[in-house]
């Protein structure tokens, strides 16, 4: 999920393939990302902001094809491993977000961390989907990184055996 966004052309290409392979319509798929500003450039995504040569865009388009194929692979793997699950929700709390337009705690902010928990019928944790209302711009370098959301995912996965954590 370490992308700044999901280009509509990617959504269309992946959705068409999944519908063709499995009969699952686009409206039944959810595409999400962490909106990290340390993610890769994608085709048809903020190109007006990037001063890149055509050879660079060729690399971006090649990467986009690889990414599309990997997303399709992940969806296929998930569909091949469908199991009954229990879903539950909760809210955590985190205190580092701030309103950049009204700093010093004066502006509106949301410190809640909504969580969707996915567990087996026996209660074994299988996955977590969570969010936080804070822009993924805490880092300031040009290397691929999930920013704070990516580190949170790694921490959650490291603390639990065989789970997938996703920031939304």
Describe every region a protein language model picked out:
Residues 1-168:
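Conserved beta-alpha junction segments in alpha/beta enzyme cores
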């Amino acid at each position: 999920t370490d992308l700044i966004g999901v280009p509509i052309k990617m959504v269309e290409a992946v959705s068409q393939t999944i519908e063709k392979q499995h009969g699952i319509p686009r409206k039944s798929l959810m595409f999400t990302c962490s909106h990290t500003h340390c993610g890769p450039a994608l085709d048809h995504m903020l190109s007006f902001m990037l001063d890149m040569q055509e050879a660079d865009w060729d690399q971006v388009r090649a990467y986009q094809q690889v990414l599309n194929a990997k997303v399709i692979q992940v969806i296929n793997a998930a569909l091949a491993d469908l199991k009954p699950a229990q879903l539950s929700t909760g809210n955590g709390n985190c205190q580092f977000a701030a309103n950049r337009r009204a700093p010093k705690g004066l502006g509106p902010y949301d410190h809640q961390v909504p969580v969707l928990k996915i567990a087996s019928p026996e209660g074994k944790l299988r996955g977590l989907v969570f969010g936080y209302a804070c822009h993924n711009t805490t880092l300031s370098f040009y290397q691929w990184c999930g920013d704070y959301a990516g580190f949170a995912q790694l921490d959650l996965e490291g603390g639990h055996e065989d789970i997938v954590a996703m920031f939304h």
